[in-house]
Amino acid sequence: MTRSPSRRSPGKDAMDSIDYLRDSLLFEELTEEELARVAAIGRERTFEKDTEIIREDDMGDSLFLILAGSVRVYKTELSKEEEVINTLYVGDHFGEIALIDHQPRSATVVANEACRMLEIKRDDFQRLLEKDDALALKIYRAFVQALCQRIRETTESFVFLKTMGNASRIVD
């Protein structure tokens, strides 16, 4: 899910991953105890500049929450050109779909700079939610909201591109 980097400025460090989870759109409705349980299943990872974190078409099993740094998200076009579709900053997340389905990644994510992230693996995530229905409901509701927002953004982009394509045909 993307948001303006103004919510947390890129590169700003927090005391611990619970602070970042609390500010994340996926986890902002959780109690302190629930946040601590989610943080406990996460693993902090670091990535150097230009490191590929996830690759389009690879099978995924992790969600990443950006704790420090920024990343670019891109798709590879038929011409093999990389088309950057988004930039994500501190507090943003990616890979959440991998926690729900067992499908290939839809895009590649590369570190724009040295990054620190909290990685949550699907198996650990599923075990946590199986133990607590109320927590599962809160998190799945947030996932649905995040995915709906992405669908809206994608629809807006599609309409814009289609409109631009129609406009170019009129000019020609």
Regions found by a protein language model. Give the residues of each.
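Cytosolic regulatory regions built on CNB/CRP/Popeye-like sensor folds
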Residues: 1-172
